[in-house]
Swiss-Prot record:
Glycans are attached at N36. Residues 80-135 are cytoplasmic. One of its GO terms (cellular component) is membrane. Residues 1-26 form the signal peptide. Keywords: Glycoprotein, Membrane, Signal, Transmembrane, Transmembrane helix. It is a single-pass type I membrane protein. It is found in: Membrane. The keyword Heme does not apply. The chain crosses the membrane at residues 59-79. It comes from the Eukaryota. This is Putative uncharacterized protein DDB_G0280341. Residues 27-58 are extracellular.
Length: 135
């Protein structure tokens, strides 16, 4: 029962942070091949996800992104790293299955995805989402 209370308390804090934290656009230049020429502010909230048989985890990435689409894969790249990153390190580089909430220029989208992968190299963080279905 105490563990359930702790999880509920942490979830409430996570929701509070996700509502009030929105990044500012720092006018980062995107590389050629991106859909946008300058980085655009975004929040990507992974509301419910799982890896194989592990328990569900949650997290959020927020900052200015460059985006690209290759086939059915949409990639959001934070060129200078996300301003907010509450994604557990155990999710980096592993396939994530579940739902996300995408707040793109304050237009909220609920998305399902078959898989997503978060990658990180030095200060650059990317999330690749395959087969996005908008609700």
């Amino acid at each position: 029962m105490k563990n359930l209370f702790k999880l509920n308390f942490l979830f409430i804090i996570f929701i509070f942070i996700s509502i009030f934290a929105f990044p500012t656009n720092s006018q980062n230049t995107c590389p050629s091949g991106s859909l946008n020429s300058t980085a655009i502010p975004i929040k990507i909230i992974i509301a419910s996800n799982s890896i194989a048989k592990n328990p569900p985890l949650s997290g959020m990435l927020a900052g200015s992104v460059c985006s690209s689409i290759t086939g059915t894969i949409t990639t959001f790249t934070f060129p200078n790293g996300p301003i907010i990153n509450t994604v557990p390190s155990g999710l980096i580089g592993k396939p994530i299955i579940g739902k996300i909430v995408l707040d793109y220029l304050n237009a909220k989208y609920g998305l399902d995805f078959s898989t997503a992968t978060i990658s990180q190299s030095s200060s650059t963080v990317s999330i690749s989402i395959s087969n996005i279905v908008k609700h």
